[in-house]
Structure formats: C-alpha cells, structure tokens
Regions:
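Acidic-basic catalytic patches of nuclease active cores, encompassing PD-(D/E)XK
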Residues: 65-95
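Residue-level signal for functionally critical sites in structured catalytic/ligand-binding pockets
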Residues: 72-76, 107-108, 120-123, 173
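Active-site metal-binding core of divalent-cation-utilizing nuclease and nuclease-like domains
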Residues: 23-31, 39-40, 83, 87-117
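Short, basic/polar, glycine-containing "phosphate-handling" surface segments that engage DNA
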Residues: 1-67, 116-117, 121-242
Length: 242
C-alpha cells in the first residue's frame, strides 16, 4: 500500500514495515495500554475524529492571525500538544535549554512520563521550516545556543545526549529522529500532517498512530534497546542486510 504523506529518509525504518505494521510485534491492544477488550482500530478511529476537530479549530485560529505571525504558541497549544495527547503523550514545556559541551540546546518540550523524550515544536508559519536556519534571532536568545535549523538542533542534541529518539515538528511536518552520531546521511521518519488532514488520509494517520504512539518510545534511556520503535529499527536493519 502507498502512503503518500509518509517519507522515510536513511535507515531509521525500512519502507516494507509500513505494509505489515498491523501484524507486527507490539500491535495488540495491551501494547497500547488499552484495557477491557478495546480494539486498536477503534481507538485509532476515535483519535482520527478528534484530530480532525483539532485541525479545523487550529486552521480557523490561523485565519485570525496576521500572515507574518509564526503562530508558535497556537501551533503548540491548539494543535501539536492536543494531537500528541491522542497518542498518549504528556508534554511539558522546557523553560531552559540543555547545556552540552558549552552549547545550550533550547528544546521546547519533553514527554514527561516516557523517558523524557525531547519534542521540539516551532511555529506553523515559521518561514525557515524545519530544515533552514531561522533568519531572525529568537525573542529571548540563549547564550551559547547553536544557531541552526530545528531539525539540526534536535539531531545534534540526540547525537550528544543519552536519549535515543526525539520528535521535531512545525505542525505541518512531524519527524521522528534517532541518534545518528555514527552516520553521515540524514535519517528520519516523516509524516506530512498538512497532507494527512487536508486530504483525509486515514490510512496514513493509522500508521502514524501505530508507529508514534507514546508506548513505542523508550521508557527511559537505559531501556532504549527494549523499546518497540528501536525493535522496529533493528528489524529493518536486519531485513536490509538479508
């Protein structure tokens, strides 16, 4: 099956896992924390309905803002945090960046109950997007903060810290990144949220739910090797070597 909103760059996952994901390890109701005989498909359908509501509310809010506004607060509070909440995330704002090797990494949020996974959220209308350096300085610049793209910020942080996975998004695009300190080539899993919700791509949303539900992530950095997403990654590497 083709998933037009999903892009896999590098070796983070193999494309063939998308087609067999529903039958993969870790896809039973209990693996998502569902009790009482609930079905994963039913939970995904409910999350889809709620996510569409959040999307419409967010888009209406954008219509009221000045075009030059990056809409950072609105992107975080009206869209990304509620969306990830449907996937089981509890997210906490980070008032201070993390200092590593003399640099400060101003990651905006973390998942508070799942290994404190870094989640960096920028504005939907941020002109630089995820892959370019912002042209303007942040409103409250942090001494020692590296001036780089949102994607590069999270990637460099993961390469230097003990967390294995992180998320970066501007509300349009959502990416899962993995520590790639041993790799030169970019490696990430990307979901085009704009396309999913504008075109009504339920099948793509179901893959998003099954791959990025909070129960897929490491419970803590020490248990990263046992996490479902790392298992999928290692299985993908093994299948590629065969």
């Amino acid at each position: 099956m083709i998933y037009p909103s999903i892009r896999i760059e590098g070796a983070i996952l193999s494309p063939d896992i998308l087609g067999r994901l529903e039958d993969a390890h870790g896809q039973r109701p209990a693996d998502f924390g569902l009790d009482g005989g609930g079905k994963v498909k039913d939970e995904i359908a409910r999350a889809w309905a709620d996510a569409q509501d959040y999307w419409r509310i967010f888009q209406r809010k954008l219509d009221t803002l000045r075009p030059e506004t990056p809409a950072t607060t609105e992107t975080r509070n009206l869209w990304v945090i509620p969306l990830l909440g449907l996937f089981g995330y509890q997210i906490e704002f980070q008032a201070k960046g993390v200092e590593l090797n003399g640099k400060t990494y101003p990651i905006s949020h973390r998942a508070t109950h799942r290994g404190r996974t870094p989640i960096h959220i920028i504005g939907y209308r941020e002109a630089a997007g995820l892959d370019r350096k912002p042209e303007r300085a942040p409103p409250r610049p942090t001494f020692g903060a590296p001036r780089m793209s949102a994607h590069a910020l999270v990637q460099e942080y993961l390469n230097l810290h003990d967390e294995l996975y992180g998320l970066v998004t501007n509300g349009r695009i959502l990416r899962l990144l993995r520590d790639s300190s041993r790799l030169i080539k970019l490696s990430y899993l990307e979901f085009d949220l704009d396309r999913i919700f504008s075109d009504g791509l339920f099948a793509d949303f179901a893959v998003l739910y099954r791959l990025l539900h909070v129960t897929r992530l490491p419970a803590n950095p020490e248990a990263a090797a046992e996490s479902l997403i790392e298992r999928y990654h290692q299985d993908s590497l093994a299948s590629g070597a065969r």
